[in-house]
Structure formats: C-alpha cells, structure tokens
Amino acid sequence: MLKLAEMLSLAGIRVTFINSHHVHRRLPDSAYFSKYPNFRFETLPDGLPDDNPRTGDQILDLLQAMEAASQPVFREILSSGSPAATCLIAEGVFVWAASVAADVGVPLLYFDTISPCGLWGLLSLPNLIQSGEFPFTDEELDEVVAGTDGVMRRRDLPSFCRIKDVNDPIIQLVIEEANHIPLAQGLIFNTFHHLEAPILSQMLTISPNIYAVGPLHAHLKSRLAGGEPSIASDSIWEEDKSCISWLDKQPSKSVIYVSIGSLAVMTRDQLYEIWHGLVDSGSRFLWARRPGSVSVPRPGPEHDDDDVVVPLDLSQGTKARGCLVGWAPQEEVLAHPSVGGFLTHSGWNSTLESVVAGQPMICWPFHADQQVNSRYVEEVWRLGLDMKDSCDRVVVAEMVREVMGSRKDEFSERASEMAKFAKMSVNPGGSSFLDFDRLIEDIKTMKILSI
C-alpha cells in the first residue's frame, strides 16, 4: 500500500496515507516521504494494547477493535480535510471504511493487497453457501471446485473455507466484504496481466474498472528510474544485512531462502520439522526467523520464542550450511546470485518478489489467500511446489532437493521466463504501466466531478 501511495505522489496526486498508530511508529523510513510536498500521514488507534502481538492468527480481534476505536477519527479525517478528499483507496477488508466513504460522498476504489486469484476464491464463498456445498468436511477437501477447470480443490480455497460454522465471525466478515466489493468504482490489484489474465477477466464481471498495476515494488523502481531511490523498506521489522555478507561467500544458486512472513506463527514442532528438513536436505539455507514467529505455551519475558532447545544435529548442520537472522532484506536476498529458491508462506508480496527475482518456490501457506497462491504457483504457473497441509521433515527435505537439485533447471527456466514478463509489464508501454496511467486519469476525473 505504501508503494502505491508513493507512485500516486510521483504522479502529482495529493495523498493522505492513513495508518494505525502501532504500525506507523514501527515504520523505519516514514520521514523519507517529506520529500513529497503533497504527501502526509494520518494515524488511527487500533483499539489494542501496545503489548498485543497483532499476529495473523488474531486478525479478527484486530479488525473488530480497529472498527470500534478508529471509525470516528477516520470519518473526521475523510470529511474535514483541507483540501477535501475526492477519492478513497481502501484495503478490501476494511468494509467499515467503505461505509464511511459512502456516507460522506467520497468515491471509493478498493485496493486488495491479496492476490486476484485469492480474492476470486473469497468471492466464491457466498455461492458455495447458497448451493449447500459449504461447510466442507475434512474428507471432502480434495474435491474439485466447480468452475475452476480442475485447478482448484477445496483445500486450495482461502483458509477460512476450513471453518465449519457458517455463522462464524470470520465467515460473516468475508460475506460482508464480498457484498461490498462490487460497490466500489474500481478495483486495484498488485499483479500483472500475463500472470493472472483469466482471473482479471473474471473480475470485470464484478467491477467495470480493473487496474492491474503490479508488481508494485518493481513498478515503483521503474517510475523512479534515474531519480532518488525509493523508501528503503516498508517493513516494520529491522533488517539484519549481515546475511548478505554470508551469501557473498556461497556458490551460485546454492542457497534456499526461508521466511514465513511478518504475521504467520508456527508451533515449536513445526519449527523443528522445517529445521530438520533443511539440514537433512544437504542444501545451504538462509532462514529469516523474526521475533514472535514461534508460538509458546506461556508467553512472557521468561518464555519467548528464542527459548528453543536446539538439538546437536541441528546446531552442527546449521553451522556447516546455514545462516539464521531475525529479519532479512528480502528483495536484496532474492536478487542475490547465490540464492536458488525460496521456501515461503506464500504471502502475496513475497510471491511477487520471488516472481520478479526469478526464484522457484516451495510454498507452505498459513492464512487467507496463501492457500490459493500456493496452488497457483505449482499447478498454474509451474514456478515451484505446494507443501500445504504438510509439515514433515522428510517432505521438506525432498522438496528442497527437487527445487535445488533434480528439477532445478526446469523450475529456474520457467521462473526466469515469468520474471521477464513481470519486468516488461512495469516498464513504459507495459500492461501495468498503462493501467497505472489510466488509474491516475480516472482519479483526476473523480476530482473534477466532485467540484
């Protein structure tokens, strides 16, 4: 979202970026935007105490608390700004923001930060409920979803489709979002046409205006070509760049990079299975394991995720072939010549960063659209392997050996080809470049109509 905001500023649009107090305090480079005279930050309370971890498994608590705490402040910002707001670009999950925009008469564009294929899975839920197919039993997860040409099984739908109760608050939130999305004047996606053309065509049945402007991290660099570099990072975690020195000493394409993103949380058993699999694979590995990424039975200063007893074989295997850091400069790591694959949680940003870097993937999804993304990586785009619903050291080791060894050339060739299309899309004349120009003109038209 922050990269999209910077691109809008570059195009001469006046931007107010609204964030939570908690996230804004942790942005490392927010002062960078002072170079844009028409860019400003506003912050909202999220209603949670400072010590709340705000991890992906607690997203419903965050959304509910934020709606209650921030809606009045948001309404005030939207209705009383000077100059007045003439367009709201909102993340799709904040349906209450869309309601406020409608109340004050501000045109709405949705920017869904999940993948279009993931959003399409989300939008299928009301129909599955209406047809009586939802909820699913565990025995039915391998049944093919109708209308997907055999690509999607029920287990490949967004994670909330595993919930057994139609009245669960998460299911009701998804239904509410699905009902709100067609009310927007357009949908903005962080993707490119060559990657998801069939899905984007389907989206036109929901919204008359579709803007595929990604991959945003590469698109922003294209727009800034010849100018100052973009914001160093929009991550809320401090990057440990010592891993780059370690990578510099490794052979070409010999390292698999491992990260489960900024929100996912694994159990200690899962930690050990992944770790054993990496060591047993015989491959070199760089693992970015952020603080708080491992759940503990009794959280507290005396029981944190660093309190992990490391067996001798893991310690020796890591010392010989591995490097562990708290958080890595991911774009730089994926672009490094020593890296030859990515074991990822399949978050959409990470997936796109891997696509642009031409890195094959091993997908171990956790939440939301990640189940869909991992299926598309293996079954549709042929860019790697899908490890969903499995966390076994033998499977991990086998998949690492495939991606880094026996099928290395196959995956690398396909990934390199897709990377070329991604980069073409964000350069002048490319599909994403043209879609963004169209977005700017449409936003300016909204401004004219609102006067």
Predicted ranges, named:
Residues M1-I451:
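Glycosyltransferase specificity loop/lid
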